[in-house]
Regions:
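Proteolytic processing junctions in secreted/extracellular precursors
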Residues: 3-15, 25, 144
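N-terminal, charge-rich interaction modules
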Residues: 12-62, 152, 157-162
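Short, surface-exposed beta-edge/turn micro-motifs
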Residues: 31-34, 80-83, 102-105
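Short His-Asn-centered micro-motif
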Residues: 37-39, 86-89, 109
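Short, intrinsically disordered low-complexity segments
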Residues: 64-95, 100
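Short basic, glycine-rich beta-strand/loop surfaces that mediate nucleic-acid
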Residues: 82-87, 117-127
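Conserved short beta-strand edge segments in small beta-sheet-based binding/regulatory domains
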Residues: 103-117
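A recognition module on extended beta-rich or small alphabeta surfaces enriched in W/G with H and D/E
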Residues: 121-162
């Protein structure tokens, strides 16, 4: 029974990661844009876990009020971080949220064709860099910093190379 439960958890986790991967590769017809952000550690000032949790709860409410369904993810960008992937968010809304929660940057992606996204690294409301790839390969899986991963996953990572 324990083996069956472990296999089921693995299946569920993989399906979550595969959903994220398919979105970032432009393979989900119902998703035309995506945003990434956290409310943690405003302007790179380290806060307590309790303070960060409260800020992310506020960000979740902000997104839901606007009709978005944020997906909880986690990662490491210098420090461990709990963040969100927000399907179908507008550029204006991700920029507004970044400013509201005093974030140095946010990421916005837009589908530009079949199976293709272009991602923007945005500071304030200015696009600083663009990339047309999200990485998932073995090199990404070995990263110890600067990656994101599906929250329930046992280590399946992804990375947009800004």
């Amino acid at each position: 029974m324990k083996k069956l439960l472990n296999e089921w958890r693995k299946f569920i986790n993989e399906s979550g990661f595969n959903r994220i991967k398919n979105i970032l590769q432009g393979k989900v017809a119902s998703v035309s844009t995506v945003g990434f952000m956290t409310a943690e550690n405003p302007m790179a000032q380290q806060l307590s876990r309790k303070e960060n949790k409260a800020l992310n709860k506020e960000l979740m409410a902000f997104m839901r009020e606007r009709g978005y369904g944020p997906i909880r993810i986690r990662g490491r960008f210098g420090n461990k971080e709990r963040s969100f992937m927000i399907p179908n968010i507008t550029r204006d809304d991700i920029v507004e949220a970044g400013k509201k929660f005093s974030q140095e940057s946010v990421i916005f992606g837009e589908k530009t064709g079949d199976n293709e996204f272009v991602f923007q690294y945005i500071e304030g409301d200015k696009t600083i860099q663009r990339r047309d790839v999200a990485l998932f390969d073995d090199e990404v899986q070995a990263r110890e910093d600067f990656f994101s991963q599906e929250r329930q996953s046992a280590g399946r990572k992804f990375y947009i190379p800004f």
